[in-house]
Amino acid sequence: EIGVRLVGSEMCIRDSIRLAIRHVKDAAEEASGGRRIYTALDVGPTGKLLKPMGDLDFETAYETFKEVMILGEKAGADLIHIETMSDTYELKAAVLAAKENTSLPVFATTIFDERGKLLTGADVPSVVAMLEGLRIDALGINCGMGPEQMLPILEQIMKYSSVPVIVKPNAGLPKQKDGETYYDVSPEEFASVMRHVVDLGAVVIGGCCGTTPAHIAEMVKQCKDIPVKPIEKKSYTVVSSYGQSVFLGTGSKIIGERINPTGKKRFKQALKEHDLDYILKEGIAQQDNGAHILDVNVGLPDIDEPTLMKEVVQELQSVTNLPLQIDTVDTVAMENALRIYNGKAMVNSVSGKQESMDAVFPLIRKYGGVVIGLALDEDGIPATAEGRVQIAKKIIAEAAKYGIEKKDIVIDALAMTISSEPEGAKVTLETLRRLRDEVGVCTVLGVSNISFGLPSRPIVNSIFYTMAMQNGLSVGIINPNSEDMMKAWYAYHALMNLDSNCENYINKYAQQPGTAPVSATGSAHKMTLKSAIERGLREEANSITSETVSYTHLRA
């Protein structure tokens, strides 16, 4: 529909792409001098923002791009170059449309501002993480600024990217004179900076707005003999949302556990009643209390989990910019969520069972993600650290067959209840150490499992949490609304010099009394109308408004 409206008619789209590619191929053959010159189908944005920031559905955008991609391949394009994208969600729709409907290599470039942000908020690591997860062939930056202004962004891209990098600047920043836009970087100046771009590691270079044949010719002249740097594989374990990236492996991160019906009567009721505002408030409370990632589990008997999981993920991403952990054993629900997720999600989980790996790894390969590997297999949970480490190695080896790297695997060392397994904590801590030191993989635990069946569980949980962090826990699945757990987290990072000058600890506790209550959930705190509107909580905003109007009426 959008393609038809933008170009004029279905026939016009088909003919425009066919004729454009034919003319480019004719020109390339004429100028080739016997060299092989490739023709790229260049695909830009739709001009619309996707929901929730705009009114365009993800799948509608996908279908629009799909039509163009298919026509491009049929017309003879050698590759697809998606460019000038300012929204990771639209970018994902375009990449999936290209990969699912053609066999062509896919390049993608985005338009960053001087802060290193896309229009919709994504930073450089977020964009790189998502695109690499989608198996892009090359990525980079185009438009928006001149070559000199692009250098700081390029340095960030080179730091995180493990695939070839593309740079296509404007001929400087756009300027106005007598009502006309012009660019003031000369071909010589442009080419001089592009030499530095190649020195930094860019593999594909070109020009965007304001560049002329003279700019490109001078760039080729100055850069053609510069050796191309080899591509360096990076080992960052990173998850992302549309607005931020979270790196695992430095300090210990927090996955908020509250969006999960297990043991939560009120949450189960909310799922059955389709009370999404309750779920969203759980997410917001955890973000406010320090979570870095939010677990999302909506599995209940007699609930359409695939549909509800997709809906909850979309709604959560409209009110929080934290990365999400897709927590389900239903692979249909998992794929639904991964497909519409805006970023690179965490996925909970796969196990060492062959059936599990056969089902989950293809989804991770297709959509990207950091997947949690449970240290159990067909024989159950090993009683020893050695057994769990061997299963971890098995998971990593099997993932490699799908092209999934170790950096995109986090192993759950499994916290066992000490009331029934007295040696459970010791085995788990040893497993954490060995996974860190011998296997070199990030780790995760559902920390509160350790205390099940015991009185005063917060005491056991917080002490064990500290011990786990000391033994290599990369990320803990905890309740961030619990003061005991958060005190343990802040204190540990201050004591281990993972909190520069104890800044986070001081900011958190300098104005607080020495003791504070433990909260099982943060949902009960009173939210203001302003906060409800800013968070996108429609039902909460309506409720607060009604209460305010009623109170005002009574006072009158």
Give, region by region, the residue ranges found by the protein language model.
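Active-site beta-loop-alpha junctions enriched in small/polar residues
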Residues: 42-46, 85-87, 109-115, 142-146, ...
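Single conserved hydrophobic/aromatic residue that forms the stacking wall/gate
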Residues: 2-8, 13, 553-556
